[in-house]
Amino acid sequence: MEVETTEPEPDCVVQPPSPSDDFSCQMRISEKISPLKTCFKKKQEQKRLGTGTLRSLRPILNTLLESGSLDGVFRARDQNRDESSLHEHIVKKPLEINPSCPPAENSMPVLIPDGTNVEGQLPEAHPSTDAPEQGVPIQDHSFPPETISGTVADSTTGHFQTDLLHPVSGDVPTSPDCVDKVMDYVPGAFQDNSFTIQYILDTSDKLSTELFQDKSEEASLELVFELVNQLQYHTHQENGIEICMDFLQGTCIYGRDCLKHHTVLPYHWQIKRTTTQKWQSVSNDSQEHLERFYCNPENDRMRMKYGGQDFWADLNAMTVFETTEFDQLRRLSTPPCSNSNSIYHTFWKFFCRDHFGWREYPESVVRLIEEANSRGLKEVRFMMWNNHYILHNSFFRREIKRRPLFRSCFILIPYLQTLGGVPTQASLPLEATSSQIICPDGVTSANFYPETWVYMHPSQDFIQVPVSAEDKSYRIIYNLFHKTVPEFKYRILQILRVQNQFLWEKYKRKKEYMNRKMSGRDRIINERHLFHGTSQDVVDGICKHNFDPRVCGKHATMFGQGSYFAKKASYSHNFSKKSSKGVHFMFLAKVLTGRYTMGSHGMRRPPPVNPGSVTSDLYDSCVDNFFEPQIFVIFNDDQSYPYFVIQYEEVSNTVSI
């Protein structure tokens, strides 16, 4: 409650804007002044917009921006500023029910209309859907039928499989749940502590029309202004301030008045200028790169580029050297949490350096090691994972380091409202990716080939089709690959689906033949999805001719002279030779492992199941360990199919800010 006097307020008349004057206000004062009266007036609270309201308003905003309807409502504060300039509405009207005089100019929301002539337009976004946290258990372990959008060849040009492999129409509508998943990062070196966001929206959202039913034009516009205010990004210059988790979830009611940082991600990097001592944000394109590199405990220094000059940043001391333009670096983050399953909190990992490098330990053990170092103890005893450990500190003091758990934008998309996610739909338990065997694609009776395949001309032996990030197959492959290959060391560039009709037919018929001799669980585990590392020069050959056991021995033949496949991508990475451009190549293949036995170096084929019988069936594959196999060796080329090609690269130690 607040006390207010009822002195008559002058009427504010807002004139249309003109180049010569801004927001002129004509005052009409009455001739008589009434006596002052004391009264009580309840302070109005800011409206709280729910997640559903925020999502339903986006198509309205998009329509207004595209049509230019807001050109007379919003204008740039400074026409000479760059694309990060703030925008404000010309008719200055606050969002309270009772209007008052125009507020201060710095209280308006950030908005860039589509019609604004901005140098350096935002790039096209590639949205992604239903992205669980890395390690989220996959309920359906199959690579499901997908819809590949885009232009494909005309089906009338071929006859090979008129009723089997259907061409995919280029007019397939994009799922409304997929469209607004990704924000377009603004290019440029620094954003002036303010960020802009542009969504690709589905204007057919029925919630939008329902939301504005029975509302006047003025009330609807106020609701739009309220939304814009809540979507504004800002950072503060002071240290010790955390990122607002309510804003990440789309529930912060304070807008630009929030005392916490409003950023796109749960982490945000800034660098301080030496002359002004002001913190400025690193370019949006570099935020994830810098975070990815920082999360690796092996990295202490990072090379930075800005304005044609190179300099270095110390990631431990958070200082910048070999330049006079900047002197410090800082990382803004959300509050810490001891639960790694929390998407919005920062989870810190603790590392201790030994003879073999940086080894991760629980925080309690690290604290114990720190205490032993400070007291000069020669050894530390502790129990971890039901085992007793002894660390000897006789010859050196153990170095301790902490780094945050890395979460990529791809993983964060469905959880963050700032990236267009839907937290209510993505609130799944965050656990390690299941190691269960992935079932094969469901092939309908009307289509012998996977429904995800696009049309290919009969003259083509094979094609490689890029997998969209919103496809479920992409997410499954992403989680399988990064289950053993750290995200902070390697980054997936592209995933290609291999379509080879001849090899697919051979593989399916061999699978049917093997299944006839199996029953129950044996049929389920007959087919596995395994990794195979290789070099760029043989990728196309494998896509056309398949994995050839006859050319084995290029890397290893310890368990037999055949084609090698591994459960873990980290093992296959050892045989993935880097190309001249720094790109690695790895296959995720379908493999019919069937019945297996221990392999040996001299085997050119699997041994018989019954050695005493001449007509005995042979084992289908050989393994490195009978009880917990990690490596499978195949001796027949019809027992495998090159399903996907994964292209990835090592995280660079240089970032352009």
Curated annotation (Swiss-Prot):
Molecular function (GO) terms for this protein are: cis-regulatory region sequence-specific DNA binding; NAD+ poly-ADP-ribosyltransferase activity; NAD+-protein-aspartate ADP-ribosyltransferase activity; NAD+-protein-cysteine ADP-ribosyltransferase activity; NAD+-protein-glutamate ADP-ribosyltransferase activity; nucleotidyltransferase activity; zinc ion binding
Q: How is it modified after translation?
A: Auto-mono-ADP-ribosylated.
Principal cellular location given in the protein's record = nucleus
This chain's source organism reads Mus musculus (Mouse)
Q: Where are the zinc fingers (C3H1-type)?
A: 238-265
Give the family from UniProt. Belongs to the ARTD/PARP family.
Role this protein plays:
ADP-ribosyltransferase that mediates mono-ADP-ribosylation of glutamate, aspartate and cysteine residues on target proteins. Acts as a negative regulator of AHR by mediating mono-ADP-ribosylation of AHR, leading to inhibit transcription activator activity of AHR.
Question: Where does the record place Acidic residues bias?
Answer: 1-10
Q: Which SUPFAM superfamilies match?
A: ADP-ribosylation, WWE domain
- Signal peptide span: none
Entry EC no(s): 2.4.2.-
Pfam families from the UniProt entry? PARP, WWE_4
**Region named Disordered:** 1-22, 121-154
Q: List the disulfide bonds.
A: none
Query: What is the catalytic activity of this protein?
Result: L-aspartyl-[protein] + NAD(+) = 4-O-(ADP-D-ribosyl)-L-aspartyl-[protein] + nicotinamide; L-glutamyl-[protein] + NAD(+) = 5-O-(ADP-D-ribosyl)-L-glutamyl-[protein] + nicotinamide; L-cysteinyl-[protein] + NAD(+) = S-(ADP-D-ribosyl)-L-cysteinyl-[protein] + nicotinamide + H(+)
Q: What is the tissue localization of expression for this protein? A: Ubiquitously expressed.
This entry carries the following GO cellular component terms, namely:
nucleus
Q: What is this protein called?
A: Protein mono-ADP-ribosyltransferase TIPARP
Lineage runs: Eukaryota, Metazoa, Chordata, Craniata, Vertebrata
What's the domain of life for this entry?
A: Eukaryota
In the record, ADP-ribosylcysteine modifications are located at: 39
Annotated PARP catalytic domain ranges read 449-657
